[in-house]
Amino acid sequence: MNTQYKLYPYRWVVLAAFAFINLTIQTLWIAYAPITGPAAKFYGVTDLQIGYFAMSFMIAFVPLSIPVSWLIDTYGFRIAVSIGALLMGIFGIVRGFAGANYTLALWSTFGLAAAQPFLLNAWTKVPANWFAMEERATAVGIVTLGNLVGTALGMVLTPILFESMTIPNIQLMYGGVAAFSAVLFVLLARETPPTPPCAPGQEVRALMLDGLKYSFTVKAFWFTLLVSFIGLGIFNGVTTWIEGIIRPRGFSPTDAGTLGALMIVGGVIGAVLMPALSDKQRKRQLFLYIAFLGSIPGMAGLTYATSSTLLYASAFVLGFFLTSAMPIAMQYAAEVTHPTPEGTSNGLIQLFGQGAVVFVYIMEAMKSADGSFTPALLLAMGLLLASLFFVSQMKDKAQ
């Protein structure tokens, strides 16, 4: 590296503060999913109305994503992410004080949902301002890990805490942690180091309109958006309804939390291992085939398993393969839309993936009379099979 460019140790402080708020927003997102049934009884509402707590995040992301990316690009990540962090801290505490008032709890959740795009859409911007090119993938990986750990914590801790705490107190505790992480970010974050970490031209913009337009002219990119829509739709659907999926088979909210956590653990391992193998082999299409094909047995087990061992193993397998598809698809999108910046192509994939909230709603609407999600899970398996056709249209870019 040219000696005029310097890397500062403080970059890890900024990254840690950023990863922490990404962790807390995910815990707030998923906190009701493993206790859907008990929460419905507490608020006196239906399972679907509890599902709105998670769905609100996906609903809010769709209209806010592009304006927030523009804000990050125009005013910098520190201002934009601080806005999101403060929204998260304020509405996290408000949700805790809502008590048994479902309406107030839901509206405060929409406030939390409005905060999420400010955090997710800066994933490439923070590393671009502070890290050298060869460190940025690692930096984004750390934020991704924080995101997944936050989801896993929400899955595991919530049903455990529910055994000794009320739902409002659980939410207030999560809100307090969120407020702490928000204050920490505002105090510690800096927009840029004193001197740049790389040569001019290597910075990444959060959104570039020219890149946006070009991306949509690439046929393979459309198929990438389709498989991302399916993959994230199924992931969000399963995590949102995790407790309802296994409840008819006699499993408890604690079982649901363990199941969700194992799915996330499998996802973390898959998201590290599969993209690394894809990089080593320099093949994207092959590993996308493996990811979607491997997800089908996991989904089948989640649909029909009646023993906890088989159910947990199925969740791990589903998480391993389904989650691993996303980083590979994102890298593929970056390659086929080059020279479009990665922030633009990845942002579009996130946008389409969050738009799959429609599948989350369809899953609940397809429940059978006895409350079983089997019809919806069979649809998910059909969509995974359809993804194999879409992947067949995603040829690797010539090296």
What are these regions (language model features)?
Residues N2-Y8, T192-T224:
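Juxtamembrane intracellular "pre-TM" segments in multi-pass secondary transporters
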Residues S108-G146:
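Cytoplasmic helix-loop-helix junction between adjacent transmembrane helices
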